[in-house]
Amino acid sequence: MLWIYKGETFNPIDTPTYYGFIYRLLFEDNDGNEYTYYGQKKLWSNTTKTALLSGDKRKYHHRFFSKNIKGKRIQCEEILSPSTNWRAYKGSMNEIPNGLRLSYKEILMFCDTKMDLTYWETSILFKEDVLFDRFNLNMNVGGKFFAGKITGSKTYE
């Protein structure tokens, strides 16, 4: 299943240069009820490896990282930024609840920084009132506010 962005199928040849995106997933049950899930997904995954002694760049090279060792600045680590599995991504839930099937994947917006990504995800989760909506599968906001812990919210499952 492909991602939809602004009503059209989103499948670029190259991964975009954005940091990540905010998404909405729609699930359906056998009775035709729709359930939503909101989240964020990074497009890049940074890893650090020891730099090659030859000075060559590895695949997915982003930049070299220097350290001050015994008063000398030595290029000793390389930061790699391979693309994440965002094309096949199906949400950060551990598993899809029984009886539900994924019916729609939508990109709501792209973000340039990690701070933007966290802010806009949190903003959307509060705006959509996810902790009180029984047709929403999000069970917490930012790891701080949990369904079932706030008066009047849905029960935590």
Model-identified regions with their sequence ranges:
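Boundary/linker segments flanking structured domains
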Residues: 1-17, 103, 108-157
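Conserved short loop/helix modules at catalytic or binding sites
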Residues: 41-114
